[in-house]
Amino acid sequence: SSAASDVYKRQVPSNLDYDMWLGPAPYKPYNKHRVHATFRGYWDYDGGGLTDMGQHYMDPVQYLLGKDDTSPVKIEVDAPQQHPDAVGIWRKIVYTYDDGCQIVLEGEGYESKGKVPYIEGPLGKVYQGFECTIPDVMEKIAEMPDPEPQNTDFLACVRNREPFALDELKGHRSSTLVNLGACALRLN
């Protein structure tokens, strides 16, 4: 038999309840790459780095753009055809809102023409590493109050029955955004 077919002939470790691990995902024979950290590379469980960490990057972008209460009307991808089981690379995903605002995500394999801003707006540009063209930005940030740590803020909101700043609807919007991107990749 070939090495490729042997990859699915692995014994499930005795300390792993593989059926519980799979949960509602479709059954696939055990393979060490389908569990632990590498499960993120399979569509059955995740959508790669985009859906694994994407919402954490999209939350502040949506907030800064005032898009917490809306969704894009168009999603375009620049990517090779995705494998049916394994998450592949993508070069770019462009989310366009009804007002023309765009969020552009650059992925692996994207070759930008020069330095591309992380956030760009009418007051300036913010680049990776917080390099910024906004005049006096550090002074403006220093004037802002320090936010409560999220876990402290969350517990206080539960105790006082107040809305949490990062509520479930904002989380839903950011999660939906990256999942729509993953769907667009698969339909590409």
Set out the residue ranges of the language-model regions.
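C-terminal helix-rich "cap/oligomerization" subdomain common to oxidoreductases
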Residues: 157-188
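Rossmann-like dinucleotide-binding domain that binds NAD(P)(H)
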Residues: 19-99, 173
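NAD(P)-dinucleotide binding in Rossmann-like oxidoreductases
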Residues: 83-87, 94-149
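Glycine- and acidic
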Residues: 41-47, 75-77, 135-140, 159-166
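A catalytic-pocket lid/entrance helix-loop region that shapes and gates access to the active site
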Residues: 9-18
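Hydrophobic alpha-helical scaffolding
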Residues: 11, 47-51, 140-144, 168
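Short, small-residue-biased leader/transition segments that mark boundaries at the very start
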Residues: 1-8
